[in-house]
Regions:
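Jelly-roll (double-stranded beta-helix
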Residues: 1-35, 44-58, 63, 68-190
């Protein structure tokens, strides 16, 4: 059972743990590109507390409108500001964070879209509504990670451990997560 939530244009979700605000302003059903706006407050990070991760099936694009962000791709840091862009090729380990003293506002795109809008809307909604599923530092419970990453297979994996191992582990743990009460806010399309 999932909760009754849908993604509508203009939906805004705040993940206070990571100091990030998601604004779903782009096309919602475009199979080629998933696009949303993101605001990171000072000290804010994306990717779950600046957790290094990979997107095996999509390239990730960042276009900054205001402020500065740092994007670390395969250990190489780049700082980008207004009008500048960074591209993370699929499969490359990366994370991003606000690199300035003011909020950073930017657009994130995934090509192809896969179901990244649903993936991030789920995560942000859960972080906003179910804070007890997270540590005080904002780290999601491991069973929640297993459920989310199994539900949205081939969207995001942790950098480091072999992806095949993560797939097997998350497939085993996802039913346990459901038994413990963890749920998605939005069903995957399908």
């Amino acid at each position: 059972m999932t909760l009754s939530m849908s993604i509508e244009r203009g939906l805004t979700l705040v993940n206070a743990f990571n100091k990030e605000t998601f604004i779903f302003s782009g096309p919602l059903d475009d199979p080629t590109t998933a696009r949303f706006d993101l605001r990171l407050e000072q000290g804010g990070s994306g990717g779950g507390n600046a957790l290094v991760h990979v997107h095996p099936g999509a390239d990730e694009h960042f276009l900054v409108r205001k402020g500065r962000i740092k994007v670390v791709i395969s250990g190489k840091e780049q700082s980008i500001g207004p009008g500048e862009r960074a591209v993370v090729p699929r499969g490359q380990p990366h994370f991003f964070a606000n690199a300035g003293e003011e909020p950073a506002e930017f657009t994130v795109e995934f090509t192809p879209a896969q179901q990244h809008l649903r993936f991030f809307a789920n995560f942000a909604s859960i972080a906003a509504k179910r804070t007890h599923w997270f540590s005080k530092q904002g780290d999601p419970h491991f069973l929640l990670i297993a459920l989310l990453l199994h539900t949205y297979r081939n969207h995001l994996y942790l950098a480091g451990p072999p992806i095949l191992l993560q797939k097997i582990l998350f497939r085993i743990l996802a039913p346990l997560a459901r038994l413990k009460g963890y749920r998605m806010e939005i069903d995957p399309a399908g």
